Regions:
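Short glycine-aspartate micro-motif
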Residues: 4-6, 21, 65-69, 198
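A short helix-loop
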Residues: 61-63, 68-71, 76-164, 245, ...
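Adenine-nucleotide phosphate-binding core of ATP-dependent small-molecule kinases
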Residues: 141-147, 151-198
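Glycine-rich phosphate-binding/hydrolytic loop that grips phosphoryl groups
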Residues: 49-52, 227-251
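Conserved phosphate-binding/catalytic loops in two-lobed NTP-binding clefts
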Residues: 197, 214-239
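Conserved phosphate-binding catalytic cores of ATP/NTP-utilizing and phosphoryl-transfer enzymes
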Residues: 38, 42-66, 241-243
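Short beta-strand-loop/turn "lid" adjacent to the catalytic site in phosphate-handling enzymes
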Residues: 1-27
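Glycine-rich phosphate-binding loops at beta-strand->alpha-helix junctions
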Residues: 194-213
Length: 251
């Protein structure tokens, strides 16, 4: 039997954080909660992503941690401190100043003739090689710019590209993203020392970036928690885990 409902109500737990897309699910959750006479737990979209990564731990860290949110529409590094009741005090400390990580991937993939969204297709190309001509990575004061690397990658695309050229460029794109993420995280762990990094969002389902973050965190003595690939894309599992966790902790 259903004993509770978890739902996304807004993008972030901030004043004036609003997006019409969340109203549909919120309304459905409110209706079901009323009809079934069960509690409704409302989370921020960002909290859901974080909870999706924490579900395998079965508990929520009480110490502050960094959450890397990398998706088609978001590139953010968030300083988080759990306040209880499923609520995180959070502060965006880094991210991208222009293109988001997913946009960078999609623009290059589509320009190379791949279907949209291009992430999985570009990853498949990148996995065919370990060779590439490096692309730049731009990070200033803990903030990334993907526009420059994207422009540099675009200049390499032509109709005369061989399959090998395409694989090499795909590898270079993901390597440049990984380089930028490492620089950004390193900057902010010096500013706000933490022991845990949680990586969430659809782009984190990419095997190359996951491996890159695993290697980086091991080298940097950070505990890394990443939502399983199938849960990185769809954060509904975060809603479910958050609701179940709250009800269990409340008895």
């Amino acid at each position: 039997p259903i004993s509770g409902i978890g739902v996304s109500g807004f993008p972030r737990r901030e004043e004036r954080s609003y997006m019409p897309a969340f109203m549909v699910g919120l309304g459905q959750g409110q209706t079901l909660s009323h009809l079934m006479n069960v509690p409704l737990h409302i989370f921020a979209h960002q909290e859901n992503h974080i909870l999706a990564a924490l579900r395998d731990l079965a508990h929520i860290p009480t110490d502050p941690f960094l959450a890397l949110h990398l998706s088609g529409g978001t590139t953010e590094l968030v300083y988080c401190h759990y306040q209880g009741e499923g609520i995180f005090e959070s502060q965006i400390v880094g991210g991208s100043k222009d293109l988001q990580g997913g946009q960078y991937v999609d623009r290059i993939g589509v320009a190379m003739g791949l279907p949209f969204p291009a992430g999985k297709h570009l990853e498949a190309l990148a996995l065919q090689t370990t060779e590439y001509e490096p692309l730049p990575s731009s990070v200033k004061d803990g903030w990334i710019s993907f526009a420059g690397p994207c422009s540099a990658a675009m200049r390499r695309i032509s109709e005369a590209m061989s399959d090998t050229d395409k694989s090499n460029l795909a590898r270079a794109v993901f390597t440049s993203i990984g380089n930028a993420l490492e620089k950004m995280i390193t900057y902010h762990t010096k500013e706000k020392p933490v022991r845990t990094l949680i990586a969430v969002g659809g782009v984190m389902s990419n095997s190359l970036l996951r491996k890159r973050m695993e290697t980086y965190c091991k080298r940097s003595y950070l505990k890394l928690h990443v939502a399983q690939p199938q849960f990185s894309v769809d954060n509904a599992t975060g809603n479910a885990f958050g609701a179940a966790y709250l009800q269990e902790s409340r008895g």
